[in-house]
């Protein structure tokens, strides 16, 4: 991580990223490990997540810790699933397997609760990956489809399609 910090030109952004690392590094590893069940793969997923976070520092809320954590955990989950898929390319993995892995890695549930505790948040919280992540990034973190595509390592069109399908499911 500290080698990646040297790539950040702005000292304020470098310090912000350092604080994020101090605050969330262990939790990021646990989220990735919960999905991957392998220490080396979890470390790879966290490292890939840091690269995405550094490239998108302007999207991370500096005032709202819950918003920042929501964004970070979404990136970590996405990168961990990408690592899992790369690791298991030979064997087909269905969406139920992914959902089971995500359920196991969810933790205390506070990650996905909005501060107002609205029923819409509860509905979204019950959705499966990737619908839940796209809706949270779009409406809670207020990201554009381009930013969502970058965060989830997918195309803009795919982010739009996922969002559309998710809204229909609501």
Region annotations inferred by a language model:
Residues 73-95:
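Arg/Lys-rich amphipathic alpha helix in sigma70-family domain 2
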Residues 99-125:
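Acidic, proline/glycine-rich intrinsically disordered inter-domain spacer in sigma factors
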Residues 28, 32, 42-53, 148, ...:
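Short, small-hydrophobic-rich alpha-helical interface motif
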Residues 123, 146, 151-170:
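DNA-recognition helix of helix-turn-helix
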Residues 21-40, 56-59, 124:
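Amphipathic, Lys/Arg- and hydrophobic-enriched alpha-helical face
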Residues 1-27, 34, 117:
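N-terminal module of bacterial RNA polymerase sigma factors
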Residues 58-74:
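Short, aromatic/basic-enriched loop-to-helix "N-cap" motif that marks the start
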Residues 134-138:
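A short pre-motif secondary-structure segment
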């Amino acid at each position: 991580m500290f080698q990646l910090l040297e790539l950040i030109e702005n000292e304020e952004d470098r310090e912000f990223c350092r604080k994020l690392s101090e605050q969330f590094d262990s939790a990021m590893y646990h989220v990735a490990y919960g999905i991957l069940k392998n220490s080396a793969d979890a470390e790879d997923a966290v490292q890939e997540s840091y690269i995405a976070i550094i490239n998108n520092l302007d999207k991370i809320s500096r005032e709202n810790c819950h918003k920042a954590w929501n964004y970070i955990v979404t990136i970590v989950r996405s990168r961990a699933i990408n690592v899992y898929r790369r690791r298991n390319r030979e064997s087909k993995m269905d969406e139920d397997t992914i959902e089971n892995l995500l359920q196991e890695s969810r933790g205390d549930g506070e990650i996905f609760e909005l501060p107002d505790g609205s029923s819409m948040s509860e509905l979204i919280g019950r959705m499966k990956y990737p619908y839940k992540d796209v809706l949270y990034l779009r409406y809670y973190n207020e990201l554009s489809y381009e930013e969502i595509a970058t965060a989830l390592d997918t195309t803009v069109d795919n982010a739009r399609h996922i969002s559309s399908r998710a809204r229909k499911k609501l």
